[in-house]
């Protein structure tokens, strides 16, 4: 049986606010606004199909990209899905239903951060909540980029302070789920390799 964390209704408004700096705009113009801020991150991670597409179109190759071939709950265009299948990436697939973070997703992310390969994680379901464990698991100095629907791209520099902010949010999610099996997820997110 899969262990998972479900996003409760009362915490959904928290997930609508940007977790970092919001760069407003659309397309490649938005990428141009923050490209100077990238400054050789430890790892560059993109979450979302449209964000990944515009990075690749601008010649910026994330170390890890997390996609589900959907945007705003609708299929992405063929151009976007084709571009996101860039040949530089090795692909890994994972099941992760909408509104949930599964232990399978977290284990896949753990393996991705341990790898030196460029990875495309294809999520069967929804990748939106992956941003939380990504920030917690990414090495310090990494940059996480994800789309804020109809607004732009959110730029998150991974610092100890940012990890602590996300850890507090994660603890709220875990406490609302009331499942002793969630200790497995907590241990992985705290850096333990044994689930």
UniProtKB/Swiss-Prot annotation:
Disulfide bonds: none annotated. GO terms for molecular function: GTP binding; kinase activity. GO terms for biological process: coenzyme A biosynthetic process. Keywords: Coenzyme A biosynthesis, GTP-binding, Kinase, Nucleotide-binding, Transferase. Pfam families: DUF359 (PF04019). It comes from the Archaea. It catalyses: 3'-dephospho-CoA + GTP = GDP + CoA + H(+). GTP binds at residues 49-50, 68, 127, 150. Its EC number is 2.7.1.237. Pathway: Cofactor biosynthesis; coenzyme A biosynthesis. InterPro entries: GTP-dep_dephospho-CoA_kin. It is an enzyme of class 2 (transferase). Catalyzes the GTP-dependent phosphorylation of the 3'-hydroxyl group of dephosphocoenzyme A to form coenzyme A (CoA). Belongs to the GTP-dependent DPCK family. This is GTP-dependent dephospho-CoA kinase. It comes from Methanosarcina acetivorans (strain ATCC 35395 / DSM 2834 / JCM 12185 / C2A).
